[in-house]
Each structure stands twice: as structure tokens, then as C-alpha cells.
């Protein structure tokens, strides 16, 4: 089957689980959304860590202490999102399931909304959100059609 042709769901084996369905070679291009969403999420986490590092360096150069920095709620929240972004990115790359993609999309949406309200940068989080959501929605649409056909 050519890569650019639509998948004829009626030719697929009956009784597949959602994980087996998602893992079919026919959906390799859609699963690529999950891989890229995971990579972008990991990069997003690294950028957050980098920005906290730059902020810490600035504070230390100006004679401040890091105790005050890490007591700030925004810094703690950014550290939490950094860890969550990296962990979810790794899990999405490894598992490539729609559930993981939706979880990552929700987390990134929350992060984007928090960044907007605090005047931060939303570019990378928004990209990860969109990649996760697009991949998960495309697989779920095909999964629902497959379930209707295989009944």
C-alpha cells in the first residue's frame, strides 16, 4: 500500500486492541506526530531549565541569593513543568499511545495558559500541544471507524 493512500479499514484484521491498531505500519506517519511531540516536550523542559539557570546566574552576579529565587512560586512551577515535560516526552516517544498524547497535550495547554498569564514564551509548549493533539485525534477518528466496521 502506498504511503499517501488512505487506509482501507475494512481490510485490517478484526479484533485489534487500540494499541495494536495504533502500532500498525499503516499509521507510521500519524505516529510520527507522537515522536515529534515527545521530542519538542523534552526540548521545552530543557529550555525551562536553561532559563532558570540564566535567571539564577543573573541573581548571583548581582549579589543576590538563590534561596529567594527558589521560594518564588513561578520558579517552582516552572521546575515542576520542566520535569513533567521531559518525563511525558520520553513516555510518549516510548509508548506512542493516544492516552499519552492527550495527557501531554493537556499538560502543555496548562503550561501555555500559565505562560500567557505570566507574560512568558509559549512557542515550544504550543508546538508540543498541537503535535500531540493532532496525532491523537487522527488516530482516534480512525479507531472509531475501525470499531464500527469490525463489529
Cite the ranges covered by each PLM segment.
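Topology signature of small-to-medium multi-pass alpha-helical membrane proteins
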Residues: 2-151
